[in-house]
């Protein structure tokens, strides 16, 4: 029986391969102008002179070829195909400084890879925090064997996103500034659905729609619900699930959720649906910001589009209760444990940075993948990749467990490149670290865990992820709040590096892009090719804050104290001055009255002296 199943799978794969197509795209990346929220027109990054950028669609087994030409003029770029494993094509993953050099203005590269995963994905720039300026869009891989195919009549793709009126290169210096010592992230100016607002989606009664939802935003998680309709979740992050009914879902930045939505049997009304940004993520709550974006399921265009009803609470479906459709059971106990503590703190330049443990990420001078390919037998030594890339070298096929302890007050969506992971445990908010809770003792992990590539961790909580290192490559693990990528919340997995050396060669056009950008392509993280353990000259973060008080700090403290004391004195003097003036005026009035009403004679000098004495007493008392 097992042999028959295997032969059937091989036959199905062979048929798909024979039917596979090559999907070609020429992407000229340019600046265009757009006003998606109707409030502010600004430059955005488009493709071929248009924005929003196109949806990439293909069938399972197809080859995608994208010829990217950077015509921005003032910025480098790259493309990452979020959620695709790039098995055998690690150099097509896209993060600059990791698997490629950034593509400078005027240069071109080709991304060429086969898609062997069905589901809902997206693509975006993975260079210098760039994608919130508009270089992000859906990527959909259709599956002829989609397990719910017989129930589906039509398909709908919805993107959710936050939106900024300022360009990211304007916001980054404001964010990474000593004038922002708490690391407060810039708050978006708007919430968008399909890169617009007040969208209508035409539907027909009595049909079932396969709705693919992608959060392509930079920061905000989004709550989503449809009035008068239920959602049956069938996929998260490219992994099919046993169907699960939900009234409301929560989607972090970078996550995807697919569900079946069956329309009503009549056309008596149109129904609103709502995307609402998670305000808990924002340090500031601008009074003029509308956190919501409303769309409508349009049954009849001639009928009105009602305002959405108020909801009593935001109570979304718990994605940890989902079960993978394929029944893949919990992986065995790990061969390697990776513990990552999320910390936000200031360095010596006064700027607030994000850390895993005591390391904030700094991009190496040589892309990490290129260091793997040029380092011979030293490729298994994590030291050559530089401590500031936070590298972990993994052996092929070992089971890896990541324990993330969130020592921060905020929520974080963590994404793993090159894999999806089994989400085997997530604590509640304020549960403390995994170790505080006794680790695995007393906990029951799901037999068939949910798998996905991006998962939310709660404030001051923890989570445990598990995956098999069966995809040789250099893969990032990072928070997908783009501000936290910029501030360093990134680690690097170097997986089966010796296998990579045997199987991978970098295309000439990718090396040419490095040359155009004056980026070395050999050596360790510092670009040293002679002594791979010599990291002198590597990119480093600012020095830590000095212990105790520096001379400048002592002087600043003294002046602050003096200023504070003077301030208190001024306040006290001001508070006493008015009663004193009133008392003095009252005494003077008494003296004048005594002079006028006294026995008709000249003013009594003794009484006058007494009055003056009384005024002196009042003055001293006050």
Curated annotation (Swiss-Prot):
Signal peptide range: 1-20
Coiled coil regions in record: none
Assigned keywords, A-Z: Cell membrane, Copper, Glycoprotein, Ion transport, Iron, Iron transport, Membrane, Metal-binding, Oxidoreductase, Repeat, Signal, Transmembrane, Transmembrane helix, Transport
Single GO MF descriptor: ferroxidase activity
Residues at which Cu cation 1 binds: 80, 415
A GO CC annotation given for this chain: high-affinity iron permease complex
Residues binding Cu cation 2: 82, 124, 480
Biological processes annotated in GO: cellular response to iron ion starvation; reductive iron assimilation
Cytoplasmic compartment spans: 574-622
EC number(s) on file: 1.-.-.-
InterPro entries: Cu-oxidase-like_N (IPR011707), Cu-oxidase_2nd (IPR001117), Cu-oxidase_C (IPR011706), Cu-oxidase_fam (IPR045087), Cu_oxidase_CS (IPR033138), Cu_oxidase_Cu_BS (IPR002355), Cupredoxin (IPR008972), CuRO_2_Fet3-like (IPR044130)
Binding site for Cu cation 3: 126, 417, 478
Gene3D superfamilies: Cupredoxins - blue copper proteins
Annotated region (Disordered), positions in chain: 597-622
Pfam family for this entry, one: Cu-oxidase_3
Binding site for Cu cation 4: 412, 479, 484
The Plastocyanin-like domain, residue ranges: 29-144, 154-301, 362-497
Extracellular side: 21-552
Broad enzyme group: oxidoreductase
Transmembrane residue ranges: 553-573
The protein's role, per its UniProt record: Cell surface ferroxidase; part of the reductive iron assimilatory system (RIA), a siderophore-independent high affinity iron uptake mechanism. Required to oxidize Fe(2+) and release it from the transporter.
Similarity comment: Belongs to the multicopper oxidase family.
PANTHER family given in the database record: IRON TRANSPORT MULTICOPPER OXIDASE FET3, MULTI-COPPER OXIDASE
Protein name in the entry: Iron transport multicopper oxidase fetC
Lineage per the UniProt record: Eukaryota, Fungi, Dikarya, Ascomycota, Pezizomycotina
């Amino acid at each position: 029986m097992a042999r028959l199943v295997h032969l059937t799978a091989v036959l199905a794969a062979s048929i798909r391969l024979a039917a596979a197509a090559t999907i070609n795209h020429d992407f000229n990346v340019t600046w265009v102008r757009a006003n998606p929220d109707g409030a502010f027109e600004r430059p955005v990054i488009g493709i071929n002179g248009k924005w929003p950028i196109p949806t990439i669609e293909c069938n399972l087994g197809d080859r995608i070829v994208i010829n990217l030409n950077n015509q921005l003029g003032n910025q480098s770029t790259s493309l990452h195909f979020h959620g695709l494993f790039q098995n055998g094509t690690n150099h097509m993953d896209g993060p600059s400084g990791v698997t490629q050099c950034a593509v400078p203005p005027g240069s071109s590269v080709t991304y060429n890879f086969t898609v062997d995963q069905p589901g809902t994905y997206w693509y975006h720039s993975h260079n210098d925090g760039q994608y919130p300026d508009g270089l992000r869009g859906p990527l959909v891989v259709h599956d002829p064997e989609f397990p719910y195919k017989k129930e589906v009549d039509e398909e709908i793709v919805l993107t959710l996103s936050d939106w900024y009126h300022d360009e990211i290169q304007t916001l980054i210096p404001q964010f990474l500034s000593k004038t922002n010592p708490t690391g407060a992230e810039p708050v978006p100016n708007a919430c968008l659905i399909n890169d617009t607002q007040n969208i209508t989606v035409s539907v027909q009664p009595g049909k079932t729609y396969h709705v693919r939802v992608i959060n392509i935003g930079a920061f905000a998680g989004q709550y989503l619900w449809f009035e008068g309709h239920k959602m049956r979740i069938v996929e998260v992050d490219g992994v099919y699930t046993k169907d699960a009914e939900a009234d409301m879902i929560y989607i972090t930045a970078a996550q995807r959720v697919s569900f079946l939505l069956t329309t009503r049997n009549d056309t008596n009304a149109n129904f609103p649906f709502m995307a609402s940004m998670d305000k808990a993520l924002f340090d500031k709550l601008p009074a003029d910001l509308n956190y919501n974006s409303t769309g409508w399921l349009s049954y009849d265009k001639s009928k009105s589009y009602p305002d959405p009803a108020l909801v009593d609470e935001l109570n979304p479906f718990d994605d940890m209760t989902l079960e993978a459709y394929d029944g893949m059971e919990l992986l065995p106990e790990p061969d390697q444990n990776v513990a990552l503590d999320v910390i936000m703190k200031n360095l010596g330049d006064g700027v607030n940075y994000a850390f895993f443990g005591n390391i904030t990420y700094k991009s190496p001078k040589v892309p990490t993948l290129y260091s793997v390919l040029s380092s011979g037998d030293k490729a298994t030594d994590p030291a050559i990749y530089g401590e500031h890339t936070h590298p972990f070298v993994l052996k092929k096929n070992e089971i890896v467990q990541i324990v993330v302890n969130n020592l921060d007050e905020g929520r974080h969506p963590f994404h793993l490149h090159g894999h999806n992971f089994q989400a085997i445990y997530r604590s509640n908010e304020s549960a403390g670290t995994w170790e505080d809770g006794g680790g695995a003792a007393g906990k029951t992990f799901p037999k068939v865990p949910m798998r996905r590539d991006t998962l939310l961790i709660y404030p001051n909580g923890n989570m445990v992820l598990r995956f098999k290192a069966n995809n040789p490559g250099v893969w990032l693990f990072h928070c997908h709040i783009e501000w936290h990528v910029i501030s360093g919340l990134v680690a690097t997995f170097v997986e089966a590096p010796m296998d990579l050396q045997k199987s991978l060669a970098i295309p000439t056009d990718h090396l040419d892009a490095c040359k155009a950008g004056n980026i070395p392509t050999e050596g360790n993280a510092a670009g040293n090719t002679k002594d791979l353990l010599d990291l002198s000259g590597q990119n480093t973060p600012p020095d830590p804050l000095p212990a105790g008080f520096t001379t400048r700090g002592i002087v600043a403290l003294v002046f602050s104290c003096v200023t504070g004391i003077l301030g208190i004195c001024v306040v006290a003097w001001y508070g006493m001055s008015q009663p004193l003036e009133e008392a003095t005026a009252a005494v003077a009035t008494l003296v004048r009255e005594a002079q006028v009403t006294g026995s008709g004679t000249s003013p009594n000098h003794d009484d006058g002296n007494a009055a003056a004495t009384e005024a002196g007493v009042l003055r001293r008392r006050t």
